[in-house]
């Protein structure tokens, strides 16, 4: 079982390096908005040609997108595979976070409509078993040490390209924050109950300077706050704000998609939905009609 658990951790690490990367999140957002050509992605995201080529190839190699030749030319378009379409719920949650985290001066996000009920689309995360709305306080680990083991593995391994980039007008606040490995891991540590600097440092194996910078970034973005618990020397406890807690369902959506797409047999899920006692399976529905949305049914509202 220990070998199987280690395989699960490696699967999560590898998956986050593909779809949790800042640029990959931007590409997926644009793809769900209807972009499928190289130049469309480049113009809408501001990604350099070399970086865009690498990220698109990664998404193709990992069965998220596939290339379709355009006639007799060398040009291709990029479309979602069946597995890639499974990221639609995560993409909807990311867009909702973008709206919640939007600050003065940020570009306006497109308004989407659910054509089934003709209402502005607002995603709602529910338990697939009991259909109750998921709340962070209702999600439990069967063994909390399993959560910390997963966190440590994520911090110690993975692709080093996941580093923080500056926020640009064509970027996304969600992609800029969650698309950074260390920021994402700090958020996950908070979900597991970590609050103190030394505990973050030990669990994540993160350099103090990097940790300080990321904590400041999270506080500046309004996702985290701190309170003094010792004055000599000054020491602080860091906790998530409601704005920070809002990212929980998005992180779960990425994790769940990665594990459900794995062909190897993995251990049963360690996360439990407390009210019904079932292994956590999150599903995204429309907040108005509570129907599961499909890409064809969520469209950008035209003024």
What are these regions (language model features)?
Residues 60-74, 221-233:
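Beta-hairpin "wing" of winged helix-turn-helix
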Residues 57, 66, 98-101, 261-262:
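Catalytic cores of eukaryotic secretory-pathway lumenal/extracellular enzymes that build
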Residues 56-57, 215-216:
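Short, hydrophobic-biased segments on the C-terminal half of alpha helices
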Residues 10-48, 108, 126, 169-210:
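N-terminal helix-turn-helix DNA-binding core of bacterial DNA-binding proteins
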Residues 1-16, 152-175:
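Short, Lys/Arg-enriched N-terminal segment that forms or immediately precedes the first helix
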Residues 20, 71-91, 232-251:
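Basic, amphipathic "hinge/linker" alpha-helix immediately C-terminal to the N-terminal HTH DNA-binding motif
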Residues 99-163, 263-303:
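C-terminal regulatory/oligomerization modules of transcriptional regulators
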Residues 23-26, 65, 87-98, 110-112, ...:
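Short, structured motif recognition centered on aromatic/hydrophobic residues
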